[in-house]
Regions:
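Extended, compositionally biased alpha-helical segments that mediate assembly or anchoring
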Residues: 1-58, 257-344
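Alpha-helix boundary/N-cap detector
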Residues: 2, 28-40, 145, 149, ...
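Short glycine-rich, low-complexity/disordered patches
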Residues: 24, 57-64, 164-181, 217-219
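Mature, Sec-exported extracytoplasmic domains of Gram-positive
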Residues: 28, 154, 179-201, 305-307, ...
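Assembly/oligomerization interface modules of large self-assembling protein complexes
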Residues: 44-130
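Long, hydrophobic alpha/beta structural blocks
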Residues: 98-102, 106-108, 112-121, 138, ...
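Long, contiguous amphipathic alpha-helices that act as assembly "spine/axial" helices in icosahedral shell
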Residues: 114-183, 315-322
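Extended oligomerization regions of viral-like shell subunits
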Residues: 196-302
Length: 344
C-alpha cells in the first residue's frame, strides 16, 4: 500500500498538484478499511491522476485537436458553411445596397447545392459518458474540505473522457473512412525504414505543404481548385513513432517538423490504434490536411445527475451529440507505405 500511495503522490506532484498529497493521517484512515474498500479507493485515486494527465495533454493552448471541434449549437450548422468556402467557377453576384448576406448565401446554395452535396459526407454521432460517486464510502477517507474537491475532480473527468473519445475515435474513424473510400489523395510507396525513404517523404511533404497554399486541384480527391491560405489551417496527423523517425537530425533541414509541433499543429494518433490499410494494401504513415477537410461539430454537451438514496451514490453522466464528417474538395493527403520497423 505504501508503494501505491507514494506513486500516486509522485504523479500528482508531477502534474502540478503539490497540495493534494495523501498524508500520514489519511493513510491511518485508509488502513482501517477492508482490503476491498482500499482497492476501490485506490482505483478512484488512480483514475483522477490519469485524467489529470489527459487534461494536461488537452490543454486548449497546446492541443492541436481543439481546432477541429466547432460549436454547432449556438449558430446552427448547414451546408452553407462550406458552400461559401469552395465554389469553383461561381459567377460573382452584383451587390447593391439592398443585397444582403442572407440573399447571397441563398442564391449560392440554390445554384450549387447538388454538386456540393454529393461531395459532403456527414452523419450524426451520440455518446454518453457515465460515472458514479459513492459519497458514503469517500467520507470515511477524506476530510470534509478535501471530499468536495475529489468528487468535483471525478465529475470533470467526463469532459476529458469525451475529448479523448472525439480525438481517438471520431477523428481517426473519419480518416479511415476517407482512405477506404478514396476521399483523400493517397501518396503511396513511401518508407521511413531507410535514409533515402525518409528524405524522399520529407521532401514530398514539404512540396505538398507549399502546394497547399497555391490555387490548384492536385491535393483534394474531387480535383476542385482549392487553396489553404494560412499556415494555421495546415495540420499534420501521425503516430509518434513515425514522427520521431522522420525528424532525425541529419534531415532536419528538409522540413522543420519541430516548428510545426511548437505551433500546436501536429496531432498524434495513439500507437496502438489500427489505421487500417489503403485500397492498395499499404499502411497510412502520415497525413497533411487542411483542417476544413474534417468536421467535428458539437450540437449538445450536457451533464446530468441522478441521486440513488438507498445506495448512497450519485450517478453522473455527460451526453455529447454532434455532426462528424469530411468532404472531397478541401486539401487532404495521406502518405502510405511500409509500416515503421527497426531502422535498417
Amino acid at each position: 500500500m505504501e508503494d501505491y500511495i507514494a506513486l500516486l503522490n509522485e504523479a500528482n506532484k508531477y502534474l502540478g498538484f503539490f497540495n493534494e498529497q495523501i498524508t500520514t493521517e489519511t493513510i491511518e484512515v485508509i488502513q482501517g478499511l477492508s482490503e476491498q474498500q482500499q482497492m476501490a479507493l485506490f482505483n478512484q485515486m488512480y483514475l483522477v491522476a490519469e485524467q489529470r494527465g489527459h487534461e494536461n495533454i488537452f490543454d486548449a493552448e497546446k492541443n492541436a485537436f481543439r481546432a477541429f471541434i466547432i460549436d454547432a449549437g449556438d449558430f446552427g450548422w448547414t451546408i452553407q458553411d462550406y458552400m461559401l468556402e469552395v465554389l469553383e467557377g461561381v459567377t460573382p453576384q452584383w451587390v447593391d445596397g439592398e443585397y444582403t448576406d442572407e440573399q447571397q448565401a441563398e442564391n449560392l446554395v440554390k445554384d450549387y447545392e447538388q454538386k456540393v452535396k454529393s461531395n459532403l459526407h456527414y452523419k450524426p454521432f451520440r455518446k454518453q459518458f457515465p460515472t458514479t460517486v459513492r459519497d458514503y464510502e469517500y467520507r470515511k477517507s477524506f476530510y470534509p474540505s478535501k471530499l468536495g474537491a475529489f468528487i468535483d475532480r471525478k465529475i470533470t473527468m467526463l469532459n476529458t473522457s469525451a475529448e479523448i473519445y472525439l480525438q481517438n475515435s471520431v477523428l481517426i474513424d473519419e480518416l479511415k473512412e476517407m482512405i477506404t473510400n478514396r476521399h483523400i489523395v493517397i501518396s503511396s510507396g513511401h518508407t521511413v525504414n531507410n535514409s533515402n525513404g525518409i528524405l524522399t517523404l520529407l521532401e514530398q511533404v514539404k512540396s505538398d505543404y507549399i502546394g497547399f497554399g497555391q490555387p490548384n486541384s492536385k491535393y483534394n480527391s474531387d480535383r476542385v481548385i482549392s487553396i489553404t491560405p494560412y499556415d494555421d489551417l495546415k495540420y499534420m496527423i501521425t503516430k509518434a513513432s513515425t514522427y520521431e523517425r522522420m525528424k532525425v537530425r541529419e534531415y532536419s533541414g528538409a522540413f522543420n517538423l519541430d516548428q510545426m509541433k511548437l505551433e500546436g499543429r501536429i496531432i498524434f494518433i495513439p500507437e496502438d490504434y489500427d489505421m487500417g490499410t489503403t485500397p492498395d494494401g499499404e499502411t497510412p504513415l502520415f497525413f497533411l490536411i487542411d483542417r476544413r477537410a474534417l468536421v467535428i461539430a458539437i450540437k449538445m454537451w450536457k451533464m446530468g445527475t441522478f441521486y440513488v438514496p438507498n445506495q448512497y451514490k450519485t450517478n453522473h453522466w455527460l451526453g455529447v451529440e454532434g455532426i462528424r464528417g469530411h468532404n472531397e474538395f478541401i486539401n487532404a493527403v495521406c502518405y502510405s507505405g511500409e509500416p515503421v520497423s527497426v531502422f535498417q
